[in-house]
Amino acid sequence: MTDQQTNGAAAEDNSPQFSLQRIYVRDLSFEAPKSPQIFRQTWEPSVALDLNTKQKALEGDFHEVVLTLSVTVKNGDEVAFIAEVQQAGIFLIANLDAPSMSHTLGAFCPNILFPYARETLDSLVTRGSFPALMLSPVNFDALYAQEMQRMQEAGEVPTVQ
């Protein structure tokens, strides 16, 4: 009976594991270079969004994933505001093969972080007295697939740090 329990525990140790440990804001910035004059102008914004993800292996099976959202909003030719958030998470990820680990860190984890980053950015913008910034959902699986395709065409090998 003891051997069966031991063997069962060993089998469980090799099963894939995923657990969110913590979500936090790593960095946050907001600039409104043309305030207060910008508030008196007719509001006709154009929005440019840049997003980026980075991963870093921590001790053991822990990984940090950082999703950076940078937004530049112009009103006409003038920059109304620039806002950036680095939303980070610590994830316990174990017993995945290399392709699954790469996908988890490059698409699954950023997908978890995005709603937090979007809400933080929206709150920051409204606290700057600008209209709410309603960012559309992002398909991180599609972005990940595009990046893998680009790397394959360039002859690069994806790496997990």
From Swiss-Prot:
A Pfam family that the UniProt record links to this protein: SecB
Organism: Pseudomonas putida (strain GB-1)
Main location group: cytoplasm
Known function: One of the proteins required for the normal export of preproteins out of the cell cytoplasm. It is a molecular chaperone that binds to a subset of precursor proteins, maintaining them in a translocation-competent state. It also specifically binds to its receptor SecA.
Entry protein name: Protein-export protein SecB
Cellular location(s): Cytoplasm
NCBIfam families in UniProt: PRK05751.1-4, secB
InterPro entries according to UniProt: SecB, SecB-like_sf
Molecular function GO terms recorded: unfolded protein binding
A GO CC annotation given for this chain: cytoplasm
Keywords for this protein: Chaperone, Cytoplasm, Protein transport, Translocation, Transport
Subunit-level organization: Homotetramer, a dimer of dimers. One homotetramer interacts with 1 SecA dimer.
GO biological process: protein folding; protein tetramerization; protein transport
UniProt record similarity statement: Belongs to the SecB family.
DNA-binding keyword on record: no
Origin superkingdom: Bacteria
